[in-house]
Amino acid sequence: MKSGFVSVVGRTNAGKSTMINSLLGENLCLVSHKENATRRKMNVVIMHKENQIVLVDTPGLHESNKSFNQLLIEAAKKSIDECDLILFVMSVFDKIDEYKKFLELKPKVEHLVVLNKVDLIEPEKLLAKLSEFNALEKVPNIIPYTSKNKFYKTKLLDEIIKYLPEHPYFFDPEYTTDKNTKDVIKELIIESIYQNLSDELPYCCEVLISKVIEKDNSLTIYADIVTDSENHKAMLIGRDANTIKRIGIVARKRISELFLLKTNLKLIVKVQKKWYDNENFLKKVGLKQ
């Protein structure tokens, strides 16, 4: 029996969360085409051949001078030092410089390079990409991957197990995440915000879950969407409340599908100026310890 923690790191939009969801077989981690959608570390529990893999989904590695983004970057870097193995995920279209930047972090544990989205590239171009890695002074263990083929899933999980220690399970095998119900619901609402709003507005929003009531095979959820200005509040609500309705419909569908319960979602938009610089608020929403 093996069990261990595996940090999943890489630049923003490398496909980390999509990869984790495909390995798990559920859409648990927040997925968006926008950068820095993942804000919080999430442990995802995967059972494979009587072994337990705890994948740690982290914020994307990127360069930024903004204090809030620095907070996300530090969370990702910290996870690198608190695991048994690192999966460095990069798109097959990324330059090898992305991997070199990762090496500059001087990881203390072994790592695998997961070359993601290989289904989108021609075979000869994939070979050319692999040859770039072979030219490095120390050639890493590279695992090609696509979420659209189960063969790649099994191959990656088999490879991960080789690096994990003999250890009892850290979590009940029935668990899929260590997050509580409120945390999972929060992520699904944030995902809907990213899907339904454009430009910079999603980055100005955070979600607080006030109450979750489970009764008679249904969920009733009271949640606040917190933004930083009255102007952004108006945009979130939209004309005739169409935008907030759309956010609610998408989030409610995802929550209902995940928990297999009829869901009633009540959203209220509130303003808290510069919430991203408020230490107490960041602790309250789980972005800072």
Residue ranges of model-derived segments:
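Conserved G1/Walker A P-loop phosphate-binding module
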Residues: 1-80, 224-227
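Residue-level signature of catalytic and energy-coupling elements of molecular machines
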Residues: 9, 19, 42, 57, ...
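Conserved glycine(s) of the Walker
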Residues: 15, 152, 243
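Signal for well-folded cores of large energy- and translation-related assemblies
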Residues: 24, 28, 43, 47, ...
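Catalytic P-loop NTPase motifs of RecA-like helicase/translocase cores
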Residues: 38, 62-63, 96, 121-122, ...
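Conserved C-terminal guanine-recognition region of P-loop GTPase G domains, centered on the G4
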Residues: 45-52, 71-142, 213-218
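Canonical P-loop GTPase G-domain recognition
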Residues: 109-110, 119-183
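P-loop NTP-binding site
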Residues: 181-289
